[in-house]
């Protein structure tokens, strides 16, 4: 098993175990004020960069969260979410044909958000910071040696993205006590291509991800 893959799986397992432990303890001591949520949904990932042409694509989300009373009409939401983020890049094949090459990024997010409750158990606005831990991006099979349009880079050259990204996020949650829908937007303020500039200093690569999420939350 590759070393990076092993450590990614080990980190994922550790994060899950930590969150489940915290949620279980909190649920035991504060049954009247805290609720565990199971989250599933979809995302649209956009890679914002001036270096070359990209297109957004859809991926999936799954995770756990805990919503608890914080102060008056404020709640606090702790969450961990696992995702697959997808996007495509304009390239030229070895036969000089233009092709869109797809990329997949496995990731895990840890977030801590304040929630302003507009209607108790039905409507709230969330905002706060989150950290995303990225695996190595996977380029579409057979397209690794395509040349990214407008550059001298190959498709495989931009796989080693930053392992950590910081996102401010804002969202809206609506529904019933035990079933809600959440829509949120996250914008990465760190350069996702920061790692690549040491290998390709003349390209001055810079990219900021934006993620639109649509999730269903089932509260236990």
Language-model regions: role of each:
Residues 31, 69-73, 119-123, 177-179:
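Outer-membrane beta-barrel channels and translocator barrels
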Residues 54-98, 218:
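Glycine- and aromatic-enriched membrane insertion/assembly motifs of diderm outer-membrane
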Residues 47-54, 84-106, 135-161, 192-206:
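Flexible, solvent-exposed loop segments that connect beta-strands
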Residues 1-39, 212, 216-220:
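Bacterial Sec-dependent N-terminal signal peptides
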Residues 32-34, 56-60, 104-108, 162-168, ...:
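Residues that define the transmembrane beta-barrel architecture of outer-membrane proteins
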Residues 27-65:
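Short glycine/proline- and aromatic-enriched beta-strand/turn motifs that initiate or cap beta-hairpins
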Residues 79, 88-89, 165-220:
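Predominantly the C-terminal beta-signal and adjacent terminal strand-loop region
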Residues 38-42, 62-68, 80-82, 110-116, ...:
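Residues on the lipid-exposed face of transmembrane beta-strands in outer-membrane beta-barrel proteins
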